[in-house]
Amino acid sequence: MKIAIIGTKGIPNTYGGFEAFAENISVRLQTQGYNVTVYQPYTENNYLEPFESVSRFGVKVFRYLPKNLQRVHYNLSSLSILQQHNPDVIICCGHSPSIFFPFFSKAFRDKLVVNMDGLEWKREKWGVVARFVLKLSERLAARYSRVMVADSMAVLRYLMSKYRKEAVFIPYGAQFGEGAENDGCTEKYNLTPMEYGLLVARIEPENRIEQAIKAFALLNKKLVVVGGVNTPYGNVLTKRYATNRNVIFAGGIYHLASLNSLRKNCRVYYHGHTAGGTNPSLLDAMAAGCTIVASDNEYNRETLADGGLYFKNNDELMAAIKAIWNFDNNERKTMAQRCDRRVKQQYTWSIVVDKYVNLINSLTNEKA
């Protein structure tokens, strides 16, 4: 059976959540006998070597177009190519390609499984026009796809209430255990184990990066910020805090052992995401045994449950950081056990893949 995955920057993951999803789901489906192809953009060479036996197909993107137009062109080209390749099921990461769904046949649209992600239009970086387009693409995805997938129950409730259409809950998975307690990453950034905070996120306003920087600075504690800073917001923050000795901008790190080294040696893990959905970076922090302080919203509480502390404002954030900093070993161990139990019960990649296999088989009327 031929499965296509579109809507990401490709595999292996060097960007974010959808790319981590595409990498993990494609490799695992391939090992179960599915013929999986990940479609991803290219600007130079259209031949892409397979990754872990997963085929990769390069979709031409014209480098001289503005980035927004590159994305539009990439989405349309991906769908057009898929129409020729004729896969059995198309897993679409995000709903931005749905602007073009109405122009394709119903037979083609009946293959579309759209992972709606969080509520993209709520992200603070978007202006009025972008929010309108995102709301429109969300509505078109709901109307023209075969199945909507929600990665959290909160998003599932929103989709079913908003669009009166059945949706399926399938979360993301967590990466377990790879990486030594210290593989040299702490030395690279001149860090003392258990004497720094950690944040792993895309450097965007809705992830409350600056709120964390200010809180750790006021408490005179080091904070390591992991995430690509080559964004408008990233450029602002790196310039604004260039002389602040308490913040280290480590850039994007995609080597799992290095990330886990930073996670396992941090005193506090900060998760400020507010835009919704089950966030892979939070799951990975839980799997690594981090002691977590998270923004208090329904998405984070659904994922983390009683495995961390929460904050709604700056005062609560600083109080939570202080509390975690003063945890003894037993308190830290208790939090880690709660996270480990929750992840293994709901958020392993084997659970996620099983749910996608069931969905794929139900759509194609084949037995598991």
Predicted regions and their residues:
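Conserved donor-binding/catalytic core segment of Leloir-type glycosyltransferases
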Residues: 4, 188-207, 213-226
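N-terminal strand-loop element at the rim of the active site
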Residues: 8-14, 28-66, 154-155, 160, ...
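An aromatic- and histidine-rich active-site surface loop
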Residues: 72-83, 87-117, 277
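Aromatic "clamp/platform" in nucleotide-sugar-dependent glycosyltransferases that forms part
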Residues: 273-274
